[in-house]
Amino acid sequence: TMAQPTNTFDTYDSVGEREDLSDVIYSISPTDTPFLSSAAKTQATAVLHEWQTDALAAAVTNNAVIEGDEATLDASVATTRLSNSSQIMDKTVVITGTQESVDKAGRASEIAYQIAKKAKELKRDMESTLTSNNAEVTGGSGTARQLGALGSWVVTNDDLASDGASGAGAGNAAHTNGTQRAFTESQLKSVIKSVWNAGGDPSMIMVGPFNKQKLSGFTGNSTRFDAGADATLYTSVDVYASDFGQLQVVPNRFSRDRDAYVLDMDYWGVAFLRDFSMHELAKTGDSEKRQLLVEATLESRNEGASGLVADLTTS
């Protein structure tokens, strides 16, 4: 006896012009995925994506040379080579021939409807993954590769609970969660100052819903104004006026509510080995199968340009 493939969507389950898929993904509620939407989009060419970082030497006050002296040759410092593994993420759709053919309420094509729905879900999964505390997994024949996420990179300017611990700053070790404590303005100001001292110019504070409300209660430094030309994206924008410039306060539904990030988005990129795409899967019966897929990784161009207040209460 033949049987349906697992998770096939048929008429019993049902209740009720084509664009380039990559454009469809990026046009779906960009404010729902603030990190993915704000990070630079770049290209990866291998499953292990590599890049280089560098830093200026510390400024000194004794750079004085004797008149007519022979030049003293400065030592050159090599760049730092960093890497992150590309992660494959997918969503699949299986629709019976009958379900595609019957007259349906609210949609002409069940396949098109389900693909559009899965595209939104895939983008949300990607935002959740990028902003998580996952450590890189290089993978193998029986193990999926995983990208080192935001929480495994930011170490230079982190504020953790006393029993928390920083990661390795290279994407391959997550930071250790500590005992949760209330989010305070002094923690935020300390991290912003640390980022600025390290050379960063942060523009965004990314928080979950609970700590967005906590931040709104901070002293007179939090203001609100209309976005003007950006009103298509935001009817209003929260701004935190720090001693080192204004930062946009952005709530994120999919990042960890226990983490508050201070981000210089010039130093974060998402490197795509394979951009968002859709494939027809082999037809093995009376059903149509589709796979939506993306393969990408997080590029931390200099983690010292961002900061983290971790181990925050969420209720």
Predicted regions, residues:
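Flexible, glycine/threonine- and acidic-rich loop/arm segments that mediate assembly and lattice contacts
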Residues: 2-315
